[in-house]
Amino acid sequence: MLLGQVVALVVLVLGTAALGVWWSARQGAVRAPRQAPAGIDWASAGIALADRVTFVQFSAEVCAACRSTSRVLGGLTGSSSGVGHRELLVDDHLDLVRSLGVLRTPTVLVVDGGGREVARMSGVVSDTQARQALNRVPTAAAEADGEGQS
């Protein structure tokens, strides 16, 4: 009886550890965009897009990961021309949240100058992950790399 309980406990611990590793690996990972609904009009939603690429961040008022992600994206957009960052509270944009399939905060959509979603990230985003997402938009990536090396 005791051996069975020990085996069950070991299986539970290993399963929990595997779940933790999987969860950590997904934090901020750059993924391909979901199939965006046709004809999203960002301007009518009150979102002014930057010339080349915009990080559209969906946040919640009480979200430490959102503040951290906002600092990372703000730093990147401040050093790159044509790159913008718009932070939206999910409570104020429920229609967009539903239509874009935003399931957690922070969720960051990488939107090109034409309004198309190029990449998507969920969870805390590092500077490296943000630059990786920026690389999905070739003209913005070249601009950011050139300015970062000056």
Features from the language model and the residues they span:
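Membrane-cytosol interface motif
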Residues: 34-47, 53
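The canonical Cys-X-X-Cys-His
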Residues: 63-66, 108
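Thioredoxin-like thiol-disulfide oxidoreductase module
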Residues: 85-104, 114, 127-138
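Short active-site neighborhood of thiol/selenol oxidoreductases, capturing the structured segment around
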Residues: 49-61
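N-terminal targeting signals for export/organelle localization
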Residues: 1-39, 150
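Typically the conserved alpha-helix immediately C-terminal to a functionally engaged Cys/Sec
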Residues: 67-79
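Non-catalytic, surface beta->alpha helical segment in thiol-disulfide oxidoreductase systems
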Residues: 110-150
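Structured extramembrane domains adjacent to transmembrane segments
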Residues: 65, 75, 84-89
